[in-house]
């Protein structure tokens, strides 16, 4: 675990809070959740949605996307300055699904962004409530992480698609703030930095002038965020080198890719938060639950309890398996896309299978899909146990891993051995140990070589019964390590396209 000296807890990042005690943090996170809930209730009223339609996850996604778009200032400004055919920069909308005469119908709605902003602020006591917006972004990001494998994006930046366990938060928008930065994986940060360096290589003016100064500040800030995720001195020292480079170029890209690979064994600290769709918070608020008074945490038992008592529905395409659709959303809700499947299965109480074996496509329905054959079903989002979400990468050791994904990034603080395929990973480290970072590289490679399989991560941490709210009696599960643990194993998941 990185030291907690100057760091704020996630919940503080989540609510832009200064230092608060646990009760205050729980209250401010609760306030954020109830704001989302109140907004959702109001939108369902505006759109005249029935209770069932309001609990449909596709409707929830459209409503969430509308409010995020209404508050996306940079894009709104861009749209006004570059008017494109048939797109009104002042309006936002999307598909809303209603049940008409025993069939699901798609209705495209359009609203003034100003009106959406008004409803959102009203639900949040007049505030912009950016924390709530970021929360929804992280939920969308977690859903993307579970649904898509970022092979193409990885290959484009010169990284290995098998490093997908480092890509948490790769679709988060830049404006997602400190809370967003906390949940980004090492690979995501590396990819953002490489894109930046490549622009600098291709565009002479990228680092120059007033704009270039801003660019440089952003570059150094991103380097510091990434540095803060690493848990070993050598990795951090190498990040200092990358950050201080006068003119970032191919040498820095090499260093970053080296660091990303090293993170498969010497894992970084990446935060995990359970962010649920707005259609979970809405009905809870409507039923009279006072999140602010009761308090709420994104990393404890609260999201599990909430899902335990929630009814969420989803549209299902003709050849999809509703149980598989449920697994996809369960993983997204618990931020578990890169967790060891054996751990997820134990906590969920039903087997969690790799992405390639799921008979389901993403949750969103494209505008050209035929609605006549659409059914809907209940998503099973309950769990057998609960566990605390981690923000450390755990310590490092070795197990069998797979062709498609050669390491994992833990979500739950549960005692276990962490799987990774050492031979495959180490094979990438042959040769190139010269240059100015050679001593650090040698040190990092040595640490990776010495990573022991028998070391246990999260000593003594276990899972808890749902009745054990105080986490008093940990159950330390034993896992069958002969089974496959990677989700994106030899995978055929769809690609994420903006």
From Swiss-Prot:
The name of this protein is: Nucleoprotein
**Where on this chain is Unconventional nuclear localization signal (motif)?**
1-18
Return the similarity comment: Belongs to the influenza viruses nucleoprotein family.
Task: Please cite one Gene Ontology biological process associated with this protein.
Answer: viral penetration into host nucleus
Q: Which UniProt keywords apply?
A: Capsid protein, Helical capsid protein, Host nucleus, Host-virus interaction, Ribonucleoprotein, RNA-binding, Viral nucleoprotein, Viral penetration into host nucleus, Virion, Virus entry into host cell
Q: How does it assemble?
A: Homomultimerizes to form the nucleocapsid. May bind host exportin-1/XPO1. Binds to viral genomic RNA. Protein-RNA contacts are mediated by a combination of electrostatic interactions between positively charged residues and the phosphate backbone and planar interactions between aromatic side chains and bases.
Instruction: Provide the residue span(s) of the region labelled Disordered.
Output: 1-21
GO CC annotations, alphabetized: helical viral capsid; host cell; host cell nucleus; ribonucleoprotein complex; viral nucleocapsid
Q: Where in the cell is it found?
A: Virion; Host nucleus
TM segment ranges: none
The free-text function statement in the UniProt record for this protein reads: Encapsidates the negative strand viral RNA, protecting it from nucleases. The encapsidated genomic RNA is termed the ribonucleoprotein (RNP) and serves as template for transcription and replication. The RNP needs to be localized in the host nucleus to start an infectious cycle, but is too large to diffuse through the nuclear pore complex. NP comprises at least 2 nuclear localization signals that are responsible for the active RNP import into the nucleus through cellular importin alpha/beta pathway.
* HAMAP family for the chain: INFV_NCAP (MF_04070)
Please report, in chain numbering, the residue ranges of the motif Bipartite nuclear localization signal: 198-216
Modified after translation how?
Late in virus-infected cells, may be cleaved from a 56-kDa protein to a 53-kDa protein by a cellular caspase. This cleavage might be a marker for the onset of apoptosis in infected cells or have a specific function in virus host interaction.
Q: Which organism is it from?
A: Influenza A virus (strain A/Hickox/1940 H1N1)
Q: Where is the signal peptide?
A: none
- Could you give a GO molecular-function term held by this entry? structural molecule activity
Q: Where is the composition biased (Basic and acidic residues)?
A: 8-21
